[in-house]
Amino acid sequence: MSYSRFLTVIVAYALSVMTALAAPPESLRTWFVDSLIKVFPADAPGTHRLVTPEFWCARNQQVSVQLAVRSVAPVPGMTVEVPPLEMRSGGKIADVRVRRVGYVIVGSHTPDTPPEELVGEAPGWYPDPLLDFPLDLEARRTHAVWVTVRVPAEARAGIYRGAIHLRAGNRLVASAPFRLRVAAATVPEQRSLKVTNWFGLDDKVSRQFYGVPAFSEEWWTLVENVARVMADHRQNVILTPLMELIQPRVVGSEIRYDFANFDRWVETFKRAGAIGYIEGGHLLGRGGESYEGSLEIPTFQLAGGQIRKESLPADDPRVEQFLASFLGALNAHLEEKGWKSIYFQHILDEAHGPEPPYYKKFAEVVHRYLPGIPTMDAVDAAHMPEELQENCDIWVPQLGRFDDQMDLLRRRIDSGHEVWFYTCLVPNGRYLNRLLDYPLLKVRLLHWVNFRHNLVGFLHWGGNYWTPEPMKDTQPVINANTTLLPAGDAFIMYPDRANKSVLSSIRFEAMREGIEDYELLRLLKTKNPAEANRLAEAAIVSFTEYVRDPVAFRKLQRELLEALAK
């Protein structure tokens, strides 16, 4: 290429950039969209536009405000700011966080689900992770600004006015005013709904996604940051990997246990506000990475003065010898720390087929060596053999498997036992779930199910079980590469390597708001049980019939807040 031709190309490129930076404000469109509606890149200007951008909330609640943005010309380096919201009489809300909604790839739709229960097109780009600004806004590609307003518990009730300001460099390109109506009702600080999203931060995960080894000081910083995100989303039950945290030591001719890492883990989550409860990891697993694999129990074995970690068959007599020592030491330590009252113990996830007798056997071991500690596990309410009914203390049945078993669950609840529920890769169809190609209202309503049916906890297995590139691959393969998971099932958070933390998602935000709804419904039940039940029954008619229209849901939300304010 000649020098003159090269210079021409460079000048043309510079002019194009300057033109983009100088794009007139009228080329950029903004409109508010209910935060329960997903904004897609192909959305035309005005899609799902809120006519009146006024948002209701309680005190001590986090409120999501979503603004869609689209431009006919690129806008590089876009930033957003939201000044403190103010009342005309002088009240102010200053705790405001601004993020942008990123897009991830969904390769295929959730199977066995009617088209009307899905959103978006697969394969395609779906909104989910919440990322920091700036944003290089491409031409004719819609993005969403996500504003989180944290309303103080002491905020005055009334209308607060705010605005979202969009800038390209130092130039203001758009402003979008909105109102926040704070009701005279307060989300309780006490977190009564027990909530767990299983997650892992073992050495493999921490090295792969964060570049730090487990138990290094950088790793403990990561753990603390993750704990804060968990607490911020009202997660209060923390899966605790016993075999990784509790370290065996040779003392004389015996194995003794060092609880220093276990203690630091628990205390880190307690300090962040995420414990709550300690959820002891499963004692039994399955071999071959298969759901039908034979049962195996990881143990520590002493041979030749050396400790090795060894998985043994369930019938091996060394298993109970190990558990007697390990659980006995754990029990003594929990008593010493005063943590027995906040501890649950898993035995085996989803015991099925020939496994329930083994569940009974090892539940008896747990009850013997951890006296007073409840066992809890995911179970199939449609198939509850006696071994599970009598030996699993806290039942966690799967949504979609207990429609016809509510009498069984009510009897269990009436007898004084806790019953939770869980979702995973199923249910699908017309049920609620937190999958990427499902509407966000399905996520929020999960915790209305908790209230509606007196189910006091919620469990999901997929907090952060990431693929190697979670932004590009949202569907891991499990069961020895035989099962493709639905999009979003395996994780609801994303790795944040730069900050040694995790990124939230719009699904995680909707989940928190559903948990806040649960607490408000529970509060209303102490004041007006008939109204609390009416609202819950209007929202959740059955497990497959529930409010699907965000406008109708917002009406119920307002009625809830107004009832509490009386």
Give the residues covered by each predicted segment.
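Surface-exposed binding patches on compact interaction domains or structured appendages
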Residues: P24-R49, V72-V147
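Aromatic-lined carbohydrate-binding surfaces of glycoside hydrolases
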Residues: V119, Y126, L131-L135, V149-R150, ...
